Design a protein with these regions (language model features):
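Phosphate-binding loop of NTP-binding sites
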Residues: 11-12, 27-30, 63-65, 73-147
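N-terminal leader/targeting and accessory segments in enzymes
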Residues: 1-94
């Protein structure tokens, strides 16, 4: 895959949500940007390096971030950081935004919607794979997009 300079490099970034998507964003940007991490369930985090980068709600309010990467499972209307995220909505991005900024020159197919995504993606994957295209399944049906 072709890579280009990423707009997320050399920035101050808050990653909110440390499930699969959040951790993959952390791994992708860890040595390229100054990262701050926040998760509602920080007691479950075992990794020492990640624990060191965890910040509190108060610290978040005192910082100015270039970007906020939020995990797909976070409902910005009902989460702990709801008011903060709404106030800073122009800074919110996802792992998909990071991926597309890295690989914008590549041909990508993205399937979104409520019903039928997995079936559609599996059919497309099989069709393209049979034609010898370099294809990968990511997201709900495979690995996080950044891994």
């Amino acid at each position: 895959m072709l890579k280009k300079k990423n707009i997320f490099f050399k920035k101050k970034i808050l990653i909110y949500g440390l499930g699969k998507s959040g951790l993959s964003a952390y791994q992708c940007l860890n040595k390229k940007s100054k990262l701050y991490l926040f998760d509602d369930k920080k007691n479950f985090i075992k990794n020492k390096d990640i624990k060191k980068k965890l910040i509190t709600y108060k610290q978040i309010k005192d910082e100015e971030f270039d970007y906020i990467i939020i995990s797909p499972g976070i409902n910005i209307n009902k989460c702990i950081l709801s008011k903060y995220l709404k106030k800073n909505s122009n800074k919110i991005n996802t792992d998909l935004d990071i991926f597309y900024s890295l690989y914008s020159r590549n041909k990508n197919i993205t399937v979104t919607g409520t019903n039928g995504k997995s079936t559609t993606v599996k059919i497309l994957y099989d069709l393209l794979k049979n034609q010898k295209f370099d294809v990968r399944l990511v997201g709900n049906i495979g690995n996080p997009i950044l891994l």
